[in-house]
Amino acid sequence: MAQITLSATVQPQQMGQRLDQTLAELFPDYSRSRLKTWIEEDLVLVNGVVQNVPRTKVYGDEHIEITVEIEDETRFEPENIPLNIVYEDDDILVINKPKDLVVHPGAGNPKGTVLNALLYHYPQIAEVPRAGIVHRLDKDTTGLMVVAKTIPAQTQLVRDLQKRKITREYEAVACGIMTKGGTVDEPMARHPTKRTHMAVHPMGKPAVTHYRIMERFRDYTRLRLRLETGRTHQIRVHMAHIAHPLLGDQTYGGRPRPPKNASEELMAVLRNFKRQALHAVMLRLQHPINGEMMEWYAPLPDDFVELVTALKADYVLHKDELDY
């Protein structure tokens, strides 16, 4: 078991909410049922006083503190899975995750994950909640992730994520020809009928994605995106919501379609690109222990480079036929 302390301040816009609902928003890494249990077990302090009634209303600006014992991750099997380490010190490591690698074990993926690899290469990380994983990438999204090697580092990184102090930027290829960048500010929640999907929903959690155009091709647009929040599938759902799903994203409507009179080469590349075209290209954060500002970049993976190269060659071949 490992002891952790979570702390946060109730925001003014949360005034009138139930305590358990507020905690779910302040500490999104933990389930609402777990947070409710902690309330009922006298583990939640509100302005220094134990509060054990989940339906209690909050008023804004209260200081919340929770000190709990968390099960370590020894129930998962360590596995000798290679990790591409971009940076490492005593407190954190940054990895460049490949495609086809799930971050955390779950239904349908009991092993063969980033977490299993971390337990093998860093046995002591079993003492850290979630083996130090503070944010995730989807199975077929590539790129940068930060992992905490100690409980103090994990606690601070989670806090910084909640305060939106960690910058995460992505490159993507979206379906359709986009004319300008912008921001998608639409709340998100679990899809009402497809439980493995997410959806824009007026009663969901706040979700904000900024995007700008890097390059236009025939029928596709290359984007640079920045997450202001970090909801599950956020970029994929937001881009689909504005009718520009990510190329290759079968879940949210981005099935590749070759442009008119496309070359055999481009059609082959599109046919063989069997994931969403999304890569976590940049990560910027303040070191959780020494406070140093740090920044990393991950080059596009080979399949993404091949995709962009083929789309660019097709655009050059047909640009005289275009009116944009």
Language-model segments: which ranges?
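RNA pseudouridine synthases
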Residues: 2-324
